[in-house]
Structure formats: C-alpha cells, structure tokens
C-alpha cells in the first residue's frame, strides 16, 4: 500500500492510538506486577477487572456505532451465558472495524457491507492497518463478554444478599413482636400472682387469728381445771390433817379410855376403813373426770387442726394448680414458636453456608480466568514492544521533519517582518541607518538559524546557504535577504520530498509483514502456498487466537500474521535509516 499525498497522516496515528489503547491501558501495570510477584494476592489481582471495565466504558463513550455493537455483544453474552463462538467474535470484530472506518471517514469495503463474512475477512487481510484493527477488536470481544457475565454475576450476588437481609429483618421483627406478647403475658401473670399473694396472706392471717382465739379459750379452760384440781388437793390435805387430828384425838381418847378403846377397837377400825374407802373412791372419780375432759379436748383440738390443715392445703393446691395451668397456657405458644424459629435459623444458616461456598468457588474460578487472561495480555504486550519502538522511532523522525519545515516557514516570517519594518520606517520617513542596523541583525540571526537546520543535510545545501550568507553580508538589501530565505526553505522542502518519494514504502516499513522464512532458533524454512506463511505451531513465538482448533476455523493464516514481530524479524532497514 503506497503512501498517498492526500491521505492524512492522522489516519495512521489514529490506528496506532486504537491499538495502544486496548493493549497499553492501566492493565499494563497489573501485568507487570504479576510478572514481578508470582504469588500475588487475589485482592490485588481483582484490579485487572477494572482495566476491562475501562475498555467497556471507553466503548460506551465513543460514537453511537460503537455503543450499538457493544449492546448487541452484551445481549449475546447474556443469552449464551458462555464464551462466544468464533463466528460471533469475528462478526463483532468486523462491526467494530466498520465503526473505525466510519469514524475515520473511510469508505468501507463492499465485501464487508454486502458480502459474506469470509469475504470481508479476506478483504481486511489485504490491508495491514485494516487487519491490525480487526485483530485488536477480535481479542477484546471475548474480554467484553466476560466483563458482561461478571456484571450479571455481581447483580445476582447483590440480589441474593438483599433477600437474605430481608429474611433476617422479617425474622427480627417477628422475634420483637413475640417478645412484646411475652412481656404482656408476664405482666398479667405477675399481677395475678400479686393478687393471689394478697388473698393468701389474708386467709392465713384470719385462720391464725381464729386458731389463736380457740387455743386461748382452751388454755383458759385448762387453767380453770387445774385450779379446781389444786383446790381438791388442798381439800384432800385438809381432810388428811383432820384425820390426823382425829387419830390423835382417838389415841388420846384410847389412852384415856383404854378400856373403852379395847372394847370399841373393832368398831373404830371398821369406821376408819369405811372412811378410807370413801375418800379413795372420790379421788378416783375426780381423776377419771379430769382425764376424760383432757382427752376430749385433745381430740377436739387435733380434729380442728387437721381440718384447718386440709382446708389450707386444698386451697393452696387449687390456687397453685390454676397458676401453673395459666403459666403453661401462656408459655406453650412461645415454646412452639421458639422451636419453629430454631428450625428456620438452621435452614437459613445452611442456605447461607451453601451460598458462601458457591460464591467462594465462583471467585476462585474468576481468579483463575483472570490470571489466564493476564498471561495472554502479557504475551501480546511482549510481542508488541518491538512494534511500539518502531512507531516511536517513526514518530520522532516525522516530528523532526515537521519541525524543520516549520522552522523554514518561521524563517520566511522573519523575512516578511523585516520587509514590513523597512516599509514602515520608509513611510514614516525615518533615517535609513536604523533600518540597515535592524536588517543586519535580523539577517545575522536568521543566517545562524538557517545554518543550524541545513548544515547537516548535504554538501549542496551547505554550499548554497554559504553563498547566500556571503551575498547577504556583502550587500545588505531585501533582495539578498529573500534569496537566503527562499533557498533555506527550498532545501528543507526538497529534503522532505526526497524521503517522501523514496523507493521503500513508509507504511510497509512501519507495519512489517511476516518474513519469507520463520526467524526461529534453527532457521527452519517454511513453504509459501497462496501467500500463506505456514510455520510450525510449536516454534511460534505467540498464538494470538487461543487454541489450535481455532486456527483451522479462521481466515488465511491469521494466527501467524503477527507471530514473528521479534528482534530478528525487524532486521529490514526502514526509510529513516
């Protein structure tokens, strides 16, 4: 492809910017960090996904054509839920290449507009810049699809976490509601217990008052009975003392009436015996009456105490049983609810653990995929380094040539400024000597600058500028000044045309095709069949299109088109050397 004069230089620069944007973005730093540290942490490795997001955002910020292609690509990825097929990737890459044509205001090939997909690929392969744009988009299609899938997985994880949070919120609200019900039931139970305590205390107090009253009455009766018994004993003692007195009197009478006592001894003995029997029977009757009264009182008191204890036990047992039934009726729903909540918590915990395991496995899979993609990017970047060096060299030479041309026009501007100054002073009728001094200084300065940019061109330019400077110093006038400026500008322009019309094509020097032989370690020659470069797969420096099966499905050996951009394949001399 020849360098056409009307074709803008910005087109080649634009294609270079497109390539460098996708392969030298912020992910370059991440790739170098992967090479420097083999065991990189996963938190640092996830930063590479930001680079893919930047690529996706860059496509969205472009024209409507890029946005439509990106939207179609994302919809296909979401429907397939897997990696795109080769046909889909080629179709998307062709559409993005057409967007590049539209953006650069280049007429798209008819094969890509109305022809088949294979014809379009063949047409793009015929031009190196078109093919470079197509291959760069072909690589980025699968990355954008993975980015879309990651966004879908992210939204799904967020939705699952929101559902779990909602379940936890509902569970907490239910627990709070049941706790409030439990508090109300507990308050009612406390009120009933307080009321029961008051009634129980009043019943116990009244019962003890009645018992104390009855016990006091019985004690008073016992005291009175004891008093009567003591009075009987006193009377018995008095009777005994009286009997003693009678005995003494009888003894006196017997002593006085000894004879009479002997006679009446029998009568007296019988009388004493009768009296003893009488007093003994009376004492036995009194003691039996006291024992009978005491046993009856003890039985009555024991019966009353048993009745009181039985009544108290029955009332207490009924009250306690009613309270127990009331408490059981209040706690049974709460117990059932607690069992149900425990089962729900166990199921929720099991579901959460399963979800965490799934997320962990998915993150590990993403990590391995990202490492593989990063390695592929690193290989591509390593092979593009010689191309970047060539482009940098090319840009430096072109900018230097443009600087020389601009310097020539600046030289002409200085000349026009001196001419206008001379005319201005002439119109104002100022003395001519300042004009000569100003013109001399300007010519000296411009000659020095002209010598700087033309002295190293060639011998012819050096001799011409030397003659022009000599004439300028001999005759300081405007004509020689114009001659010097014109010659310097002409030399710079001729130098540009010399390299512009050189035999070696500029574009082919910049984007070098594959050489006629594979520059591998043993310099094994290859066979050339229908303009295809067939190199052994195991000796290729890089495989830009993935597995070996993909190579058989693509166009004319795309997989080795840029496989030999190494230091040995760049031995062809470009035009600037």
Swiss-Prot record:
Q: Where in the cell is it found?
A: Endoplasmic reticulum membrane; Nucleus membrane
Please report what switches on or represses expression of this protein. Answer: During conjugation.
Q: Single Gene Ontology BP term? A: karyogamy involved in conjugation with cellular fusion
Reading the lineage from the top rank, the first entry is Eukaryota
Posttranslational modification: N-glycosylated.
4Fe-4S as UniProt keyword: no
Q: Does the keyword Transmembrane apply?
A: yes
Q: Which residues are glycosylated?
A: 163, 372
Pfam families per the UniProt record, alphabetical: Tht1 (PF04163)
Using the UniProt record, give the first listed, main subcellular location.
Answer: endoplasmic reticulum
Cytoplasmic side of membrane: 426-433, 492-577
Q: Which UniProt keywords apply?
A: Endoplasmic reticulum, Glycoprotein, Karyogamy, Membrane, Nucleus, Signal, Transmembrane, Transmembrane helix
Signal peptide position in this chain?
A: 1-29
**Any single GO CC term annotated in Swiss-Prot or TrEMBL for this entry:** nuclear membrane
How this chain sits in the membrane, per its record, is: Multi-pass membrane protein
Which ranges of this chain reside in the Lumenal compartment per its record? 30-404, 455-470
Q: Which residues cross the membrane?
A: 405-425, 434-454, 471-491
InterPro entries reported in the protein's UniProt record:
Nuclear_fusion_Kar5
Q: Into which family does the record put it?
A: Belongs to the KAR5 family.
Q: What task does this protein carry out?
A: Required for nuclear membrane fusion during karyogamy.
Name of the featured protein: Nuclear fusion protein tht1
Q: What is the lineage of its organism?
A: Eukaryota, Fungi, Dikarya, Ascomycota, Taphrinomycotina
What is this protein's gene name? tht1
